[in-house]
Regions:
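Proteolytic processing hotspots in large secreted/extracellular or virion-associated proteins
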Residues: 114-138
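Extracellular beta-helix/beta-solenoid repeat scaffolds
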Residues: 5-112, 133, 137-147, 151-152, ...
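A generic structural motif
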Residues: 122-128, 157-173
Length: 237
């Protein structure tokens, strides 16, 4: 096992079954194959990750990953950068020039609409479908007015059919009227606010040490005569 803070390379002839959390490394390079089995929650934490010619996989289309997987990149905005290519360098970065395949799980309903208006101060709302939504999940309610900042992110405390109870209370009003007539030419405009389910079991997480988010780059480059073309399948992530 690598020690904390080391640079780690998975060689091209290796297949690693990651059934334990690795140490917090500085730079993880994957030239071989890393498979995360669906046996328990898993955390990967580094300063930078490069899937160079290899692959990182959790789950598949037939058997999605059902546990929690957090891929966390740490670092500060002014930390020294890593050079991947003359045209690509940076810190707090995840670069894919190989293959990244992540298949998570999500409820059957990931987007719904309000069936009645929800007002500032409310701690419940009703949507047209909440299939698979559960206590502890997070949802986001789209704004109904001109300011894009009036979206709201809340945590579900209870579910009763299509009625969702949550915390904290709403700060803004969100329309649930089914439609309004604009005119005979343009017909009907649906004014119901959208409600999105945003809880996922596979997450890309920026380290808590700064407000500087990390960058996921799916990239193509030449290495000598070899052309590397990154591929990513991110399903319910």
């Amino acid at each position: 096992m690598p020690l904390p803070g080391e640079n780690v390379t998975v060689d091209g002839n290796w297949t690693i079954i990651m059934d334990v959390d690795p140490a917090v490394c500085e730079f993880l390079t994957i030239d071989g194959s890393v498979i995360i089995p669906d046996t328990s929650d898993r955390n990967i934490e580094c300063q930078a990750i490069w899937i160079r010619v290899g692959s990182l996989q959790a789950g598949s289309a037939a058997t999605p990953f059902t546990h929690n997987l957090n891929i966390q990149i740490d670092g500060l905005k002014n930390d020294p950068g890593y050079v991947f290519d003359p045209s690509l360098e940076g810190n707090k970065i995840f670069v894919v020039t190989g293959t990244l395949s992540l298949y998570g799980t999500s409820p059957s309903t990931i987007s719904a609409n309000l069936t009645a208006s929800a007002f500032a101060g409310n701690t419940s709302l009703t949507v047209d479908s909440a299939s698979g939504w559960a206590i502890g999940d997070e949802i986001v309610i789209a704004p109904s007015f001109s300011s894009s900042r009036e979206y709201e992110r809340v945590s579900i405390t209870n579910v009763s059919g299509n009625t969702i109870y949550f915390t904290p209370a709403l700060q803004y009003t969100h329309y649930g009227a089914p439609s309004v007539t604009i005119n005979n030419t343009y017909g009907i405009l649906d004014t119901r606010a959208s409600v999105g389910h945003i809880t996922r079991n596979i997450k890309f997480i920026s380290g808590p040490d700064s407000g500087w988010g990390y960058t996921l780059v799916i990239y193509s480059l030449w290495e000598g005569i070899n052309y590397r073309a990154g591929q990513a399948i991110l399903n319910s992530v």
